Structure formats: structure tokens, C-alpha cells
UniProtKB/Swiss-Prot annotation:
The keyword Signal applies. This is Alpha-conotoxin-like Sm1.3. Transmembrane segments: none annotated. It comes from Conus stercusmuscarum. The modification Methionine sulfoxide is found at M58. GO terms for molecular function: acetylcholine receptor inhibitor activity; toxin activity. Expressed by the venom duct. The cysteine framework is I (CC-C-C). Alpha3/5 pattern. Pfam families: Toxin_8. The lineage of its organism: Eukaryota, Metazoa, Spiralia, Lophotrochozoa, Mollusca. Alpha-conotoxins act on postsynaptic membranes, they bind to the nicotinic acetylcholine receptors (nAChR) and thus inhibit them.
């Protein structure tokens, strides 16, 4: 539950941070990745060994 809380805080921080035009593409990519991580965490994917392996780039390599 704490992990989900941290992910939500991270996503909120990424979304609400001010940006300039040069970094808009990078921010969009970060927002998308944060959204994917939150979606996986909420689904319990990162705690499921099979799903974790399939999405190790989102869940982290270690288990």
C-alpha cells in the first residue's frame, strides 16, 4: 500500500512540475512511464512473479 502511495506522489510530482518547451517531450515520456508503473502496481502486477518478469522494465529488475 505504501508503494502505491509513493507511486501516486511521484506521478503527481511529475505531472505538476513546471516545464519549458524543450523538455516537453521528456516530460511526456516520464508521465507515460509513471502512469504505466502506477497501473501495473494497482493491478498487483509487480507482486506477481510472471507479470513481474514480463514487465521487469517497469517493476524493476530485482525481486
Amino acid at each position: 500500500m505504501f508503494t502505491v502511495f509513493l507511486l501516486v506522489v511521484l506521478a503527481t510530482t511529475v505531472v505538476s512540475s513546471p516545464s519549458d518547451r524543450a523538455s516537453d517531450g521528456r516530460n511526456a515520456a516520464a508521465n507515460e512511464k509513471a502512469s504505466d508503473v502506477i497501473a501495473l502496481a494497482l493491478k498487483g502486477c509487480c507482486s506477481n512473479p510472471v507479470c513481474h518478469l514480463e514487465h521487469s522494465n517497469m517493476c524493476g529488475r530485482r525481486r
